């Protein structure tokens, strides 16, 4: 147990003030051998982690219960007309696409497109698939399952082979 969270990438990270001072000293003295290790760290170490980014629930939530199968996905950036749900070869496909349009700040444009595919369990009845989009932008897709292998229980009798007469057993031993 530790008192502080350990992140192996912290070895390469420094505070903005430390980076400023190190860069100032490095530029002043320009001694390549004294460069800190963070200056040679790979570029991807300075990228924000996925949990720090505001990318929403990109994977969705899959609910696979005994009698139903459901998928919930956050599609709040899309209008209902920009979404499609289909089933292809036991695969549930959710697709969203909106064409390029100017962003709200007016500095550029935004175009979004995604495809999410989920393999349907064998028990899912494709005819019962329904979808619903909430007012908060959560798409819920539900389907019923058929009962698989539900047979009544029964006792299976054990058949024992007949005992051999004792006379035959003695002759076999000799």
From Swiss-Prot:
Keyword Mitochondrion attributed: no
Gene that produces this protein: OV25-1
One MF term in the entry's GO annotations: unfolded protein binding
GO CC term, one of those recorded: cytoplasm
Region spans: Disordered: 153-174
Keywords of the record: Stress response
GO terms for biological process, alphabetical: protein refolding; response to heat
Residue stretches making up the sHSP domain: 50-161
Keyword check for NADP: no
Annotated family: Belongs to the small heat shock protein (HSP20) family.
Superkingdom: Eukaryota
Cited CDD domains: metazoan_ACD
Gene3D superfamilies hit by this protein: 2.60.40.790
Name of the molecule in the record: Small heat shock protein OV25-1
Compositionally biased residues, Basic and acidic residues: 161-174
């Amino acid at each position: 147990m530790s008192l502080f969270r350990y992140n192996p990438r912290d070895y390469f990270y420094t505070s903005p003030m430390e980076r400023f001072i190190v860069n100032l000293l490095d530029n002043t003295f320009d001694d390549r051998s004294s460069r800190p290790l963070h200056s040679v760290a790979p570029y991807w170490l300075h990228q924000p982690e996925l949990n720090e980014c505001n990318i929403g629930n990109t994977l969705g939530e899959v609910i696979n219960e005994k009698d139903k199968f459901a998928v919930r996905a956050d599609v709040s950036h899309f209008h209902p007309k920009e979404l499609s749900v289909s089933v292809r070869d036991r695969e549930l496909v959710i697709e969203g696409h909106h064409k390029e349009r100017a962003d709200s700040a007016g500095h550029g444009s935004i175009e979004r497109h995604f495809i999410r595919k989920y393999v349907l369990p064998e028990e899912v009845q494709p005819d019962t698939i329904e979808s619903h989009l909430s007012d908060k932008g959560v798409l819920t897709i539900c389907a019923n399952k058929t009962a698989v292998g539900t047979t009544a229980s029964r006792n299976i009798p054990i058949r024992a082979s007949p005992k051999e007469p004792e006379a035959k057993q003695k002759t076999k031993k000799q």
